[in-house]
From Swiss-Prot:
Domain notes: The B-chain consists of six tandemly repeated subdomains. Only subdomains 1-alpha and 2-gamma possess a functional carbohydrate-binding site.
Gene3D superfamilies named among the record's database cross-references: 2.80.10.50, Ricin (A subunit), domain 1 (3.40.420.10), Ricin (A Subunit), domain 2 (4.10.470.10)
Ranges of the 1-beta repeats in the UniProt entry: 370-405
UniProt record similarity statement: Belongs to the ribosome-inactivating protein family. Type 2 RIP subfamily.
Provenance organism: Sambucus nigra (European elder)
Role according to the record: Neu5Ac(alpha2-6)Gal/GalNAc specific agglutinin. Behaves as a type-2 ribosome-inactivating protein. Strongly inhibits mammalian but not plant ribosomes. The A chain is responsible for inhibiting protein synthesis through the catalytic inactivation of 60S ribosomal subunits by removing adenine from position 4,324 of 28S rRNA. The B chain binds to cell receptors and probably facilitates the entry into the cell of the A chain; B chains are also responsible for cell agglutination (lectin activity). Involved in plant defense against insects.
2-alpha repeat intervals: 452-489
Signal peptide: 1-28
Protein name: Ribosome-inactivating protein SNAIf
Cystine residue pairs: C284-C316, C332-C351, C373-C385, C455-C470, C496-C513
Domain Ricin B-type lectin: 319-439, 441-566
EC number of this enzyme: 3.2.2.22
Residues carrying a glycan: N40, N62, N140, N232, N492, N526, N544
Length: 570
């Protein structure tokens, strides 16, 4: 009888453990204590620090690509380090806790009021380690955008983001019960929190839009560029990690602008200027180093990356690519008259689709046109690769736009900004006439947002630049970013952002473009805009926008040196 009673007890226990329809079972073990990063909507100025803290928690290793952190693959993350908990609180005091996977920044579950909800197809790792002291239930849809939008009934392009939307989303997640049946408010709330947490951690462009909306207590709907970023984070990460050391992508990242026009991005520099991508999904890692370097000499050795994921390794080699090269004044590197003869001059010409502007970047360090090598001699020319010293045909492309011949240490230079100008090799003074971009030869028109989310503003030649509130379509705040590294007044592209000299506290003004060292700028992954000639960065003087002064200054890491480009100011 005692045995029968015990068996009945075990049967009843098993049945009770199933709970209501949709409830989950898991192995009852002591769960790990996962790190937590919280955000309270009543502290609007804490949104940026909240995202920095979240990024620090999900980045477990020191693997980087072009100075951007790369998340660890699943095979290298233990269950005890797999998740980060993110409690979100709205002004009404409602709190919901998200569980975020450190492998991909996905929201995989959420919990509130003693209940937790997992997406359809949740894994044992998730169920056995997350919210085990709650009643676990499984939703009848997955966490991807297609599934969530299907539940809502329309796309996220129509769903506002901002403090009001986030507050409502938190309440929707907190009050949801599986028995209620209506998943539309829940799915809508999930679309809001995923974009305002995970996507903002992936892209500083998205962070800026949301941070501005929180500061201004306003709402906005995602533009098509933002949505295309969200849809292409994986492909961006892959292209960046497989790129040649100079940032040349093996393929093309397909984005859309705000008017739904296609944008084809073929190098890291342009992709970063468009998206300010902040974190990469793991794809490829260098074999010989844990990061790619921007240093021209170190970059001579092309590092062959390896794909690690799913318990296997797959070699992911750097490949040859064929691209145009844009330089001073937006002119392209061109073989004179397209003549296929040894010694023919390499010059500047208007960018077009001509064959004589298509250069192949080989993994042996050569740059070739129809098989002939870009070659250094008394001038820069094309020549049979097999009949000249190999060191005369080697080049290193850096992400700052410098193209260096390692043997001489000299860099590719355009002596004049004129069609037909023969290229030369000169000492590197980091001048704009020595700046180049591979692929993406058209200038990018953008706003430049800095301290207190205000926009860089100009008032014509021989005047200072300063910060003012951003105003959509204000021509004084529109800039054209050229492949030569210049920042030009979009309404008059003969005018360049210029440092008066190259010493700390020198003012930044607008002058005629001359291809000089004080007119070349680099948008860095740490958020600064540096002048490589001076080795100083753009700085809002004394962190005081009322002074109306932007200066050169040594890097400090302070907010008054942080900048971001955006084609759609918030």
């Amino acid at each position: 009888m005692r045995v029968v009673t015990k068996l009945l007890y075990l049967v009843v226990l098993a049945i009770c453990g199933l709970g209501i329809h949709g409830a989950l079972t898991h192995t009852r073990v002591t769960p790990p204590v996962y790190p937590s990063v919280s955000f309270n909507l009543t502290g609007a100025d804490t949104y940026g620090p909240f995202l920095r803290a979240l990024q620090e928690k999900v980045i477990l290793g020191n693997h980087t690509a072009f100075d951007l952190p790369v998340l660890n693959p699943e095979s290298q993350v233990s269950d005890s380090n797999r998740f980060v908990l993110v409690p979100l609180t709205n002004p009404s005091g409602d709190t919901v806790t998200l569980a975020i996977d450190v492998v991909n920044l996905y929201v995989v579950a959420f919990s509130s009021n003693g209940r937790s909800y997992f997406f359809s197809g949740s894994t044992a790792v998730q169920r056995d380690n997350l919210f085990v002291d709650t009643t676990q239930e499984e939703l009848n849809f997955t966490g991807n955008y297609i599934s969530l939008e299907r539940q809502v009934g329309f796309g996220r392009v129509y769903i506002p983001l901002g403090p009001k939307s986030l507050a409502q989303a938190i309440s929707s997640l907190r009050t949801y019960t599986l028995s209620a049946g209506d998943t539309k408010p829940l799915a809508r709330g999930l679309l809001v929190v995923i974009q305002m947490v995970s996507e903002a951690a992936r892209f500083r462009y998205i962070e800026l839009r949301i941070r501005t909306s929180i500061t201004d207590a306003s709402e906005f709907t995602p533009d098509l560029l933002m949505l295309s970023m969200e849809n292409n984070w994986s492909s961006m990460s892959s292209e960046i990690q497989q790129a040649q050391p100079g940032g040349i992508f093996p393929g093309v990242v397909q984005l859309r602008d705000e008017r739904n026009n296609p944008i084809e991005v073929t190098n890291f520099r342009r992709l970063f200027e468009l998206t300010y991508i902040a974190v990469l999904l793991y794809g490829c890692a260098p074999v010989t180093s844990n990061s790619y370097t921007n240093n021209a000499i170190d970059a001579q050795i092309i590092k062959m990356p390896v794909f690690r994921g799913g318990g296997y390794e797959k070699v992911c080699s750097v490949v040859e690519v064929t691209r145009r090269i844009s330089g001073w004044d937006g002119l392209c590197v061109d073989v004179r008259d397209g003549h296929y003869i040894d010694g023919n001059t390499v010059q500047l010409g208007p960018c077009g689709n001509e064959c004589n502007q298509l250069w192949t970047f080989r993994t042996d360090g050569t740059i070739r046109w129809l098989g002939k090598c870009l070659t250094t001699s008394s001038s820069v020319m094309i020549y049979d690769c097999n009949t000249v010293p190999p060191e005369a045909t080697k080049w290193v492309v850096s992400t700052d736009g410098t193209i260096t011949n390692p043997r001489s240490g000299l860099v590719l230079t355009a002596p004049q900004a004129a069609e037909g100008t023969a290229l030369s090799l000169e000492n590197n003074i980091h001048a704009a006439r020595q700046g180049w971009t591979v692929g993406d030869v058209e200038p990018l028109v953008t706003f430049i947002v800095g301290y207190k989310q205000m926009c860089l503003t100009e008032n014509g030649e021989n005047n200072f630049v300063w910060l003012e509130d951003c105003v959509l379509n204000r021509v004084e705040q529109e800039w054209a970013l050229y492949g030569d590294g210049t920042i030009r007044v979009n309404s008059n592209r003969s005018l360049c952002v210029t440092s008066e000299d190259h010493e700390p506290s020198d003012l930044i003004v607008i002058l005629k473009c001359e291809g000089s060292g004080n007119q070349r700028w680099v948008f860095n992954t740490n958020g600064t805009i540096s002048n490589p000639n001076a080795k100083l960065v753009m700085d809002v003087a004394q962190s005081n926008v009322s002074l109306r002064k932007i200066i050169l200054y040594p890097p400090t890491g302070n907010p008054n040196q942080q900048w971001i480009t955006t084609t759609q100011p918030a």
